[in-house]
Amino acid sequence: SIGFILHQTFDSTDVLYPKQISSMLFQIISVDVLVAWCVSIRNRILNKQIRRYLILVGILMIFWLTVRIVKWRFLSVTDPMGRYLWYAYYIPMIMIPLFGVFIVQYAGKREDYVIPKKFNLLFIPSFALLVFIFTNDIHRCVFEFPEGIINYNDIYDYKWGFFIVVAWFVSLGFYFTVMLLVKSRVPGSRSFQRLPAVIMVLAAGLWALYSLGILKIDLAAMDCLIIALLLESAIQSGLIRSNTGYNELFE
């Protein structure tokens, strides 16, 4: 139960403030919702390749939120392991947009369709970006720590490498959304089908404000919410086919 989880998470000497409790409850509920979403994807999505990649996206989001819980609740803010868990946030941030590209390539195709091998080359920059992030302690080209690395959690600056990661995340997200809209040929409900594009535009705006330091928000929660909304809106609007009685949507 939620009570048991909270008891295990906070020891008896902790002072539980309402903000802490509400934050922990939100994280637990978010993970539960994502697990349920993955199960529903298995039952709803017709194309097995799209189904597989959507489930992988769900697993990555669960990983993202779980890593966040471990970092903030079980580790000291000066623990080096916490810094690498912070870097681990970027595993889903880099891989989820890539899986989105694969999803859109399979959209509307036969079950035996195999995407061109050239798309596998996208794994190269993905893994290169991950290596770049996890070696940040050496080159400091993603994050810089003006007050020393021991204070990484409180005082850090974004460097040029961070904006490359943002560009990857946003550009592939736009590619996913635009290509779904281009492939769709349903004559009605265009306003609802444009919802994924609207979500992506709002996401880009939030990312820009966050990167410039104007907006202070929970990055992991925001990104998971945006991703889930984007994918579910594509399913509900028929841009990704499901077993809910839609006619042919793609050429």
Question: What positions do the PLM features span?
Answer:
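Short, hydrophobic transmembrane alpha-helix segments
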Residues: 8-22, 39-48, 212
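Alpha-helical transmembrane segments of multi-pass integral membrane proteins
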Residues: 43-66, 87, 118-126, 156-212
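Interfacial "cap-and-anchor" motif at the non-cytosolic start of specific transmembrane alpha-helices
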Residues: 181-249
